[in-house]
Amino acid sequence: MLASRCCMLFVCAATVVSSVVAGDDVAQAQREKKFGEALSGAVLVGTFSIDGVKTDKLRLPERYELKSVKKTKDGLWTFMAHVTYFKQDVTLPITVPVVWAGDTPMVSLSNSTLPGLGNQLSAKVIFDGGRYAGTWQHGKFGGHLWGKIERADVSKSKPATEK
């Protein structure tokens, strides 16, 4: 009798857990679809800082024009991007890991190499509504980055430094 009850409890628990997991998978697929659609055709227009460098008077603009953003496999996403900061002005595919903190996506690079951008790159960048923010490290240099997510046609109005 006890074995029968334990077996029944296990079957019920397995059914509940599998339906919750299936629901989580559906919700995650919806979040990923929304993330890809929100960033494809968007422009990240913002500012970055360099630790140890006074930026009160010197605003360091950055601009990432995202042609497309697609999940590839195993948590990796490819951002087809035109990148502009400092003397960088390149268009290239950037494949990076994206992890999720609940419903919030975050690019999570750790001591990585990105073709066209260099090596020893680390970044943790979250995307929340119409904003992005995070930290970055490139070799000995690092800092913060933050800005707005705009549609490509709207963002051509003013560079980040003319606010």
Report the location of each language-model feature.
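Bacterial N-terminal signal peptides
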Residues: C7-S18
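Central antiparallel beta-sheet cores of small beta-barrel/beta-sandwich binding domains
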Residues: A29-K33, A38-K163
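N-terminal secretory signal peptides that target proteins for export/translocation
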Residues: M1-S4
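Boundary at the C-terminal end of the N-terminal hydrophobic targeting segment
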Residues: V20-G23, A27-A29
